[in-house]
Amino acid sequence: MKNKLEQRVAKLEKELREVKEELGKRKYTGLKVGDTFELIEKKWKILGSNGNGVFCLCMESLGDKTLDSKCNEWTSSNLRDYLSTEIYKKICEEIGTENVIGFERDLLSLDGKSEYGTCKDFVSLISIDEYRKYRSMIPNFKEWWWTLTPYSTKCNDDAIWCTVVSPSGCIFSRYCNIQYGVRPVCIFSSTLFESEDD
């Protein structure tokens, strides 16, 4: 008798999780470029879409953090590790791993050095090129915040400067070991935003 009751409770708990998941996903349906939505208790904005999915920026900082204590190279940075573990996990718990799309990041420096190459992220920071592309949709914020674009690279004897966005929206370079705001970008599956009529 006890075993059957436990099985029934487990089945009901599973069904409840599935219903919650489905309802959680529906809250994003029908959104389009320029719209905002809430995810991990933060406001996000849809900046664009392509064949891979929907490119979104977190409009609220996750707090102030250093990029890294020693180097401006994104692939080895502490901030990338934080976004790829803690924040990725939180996002996936809310919308499912199938809705968070990996995407290539171009680590070209502000002065045109390609030494750092590219990498693939699921949760990342905006690059300077992306910031320029979507600038008309990104309002000024009251604080400084990180981009993943280095000012230069090790081959120029510069492994500590990285680009940041000022409260006025201008681009500056700062030491990678100073704390600034963290506004991640992600590509989410376009199916998450499709209305039931699509």
Model-found features: residue ranges?
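Acidic, low-complexity intrinsically disordered segments
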Residues: M1-A10
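Collagenous Gly-X-Y triple-helix signature in extracellular proteins
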Residues: A10, E18-D198
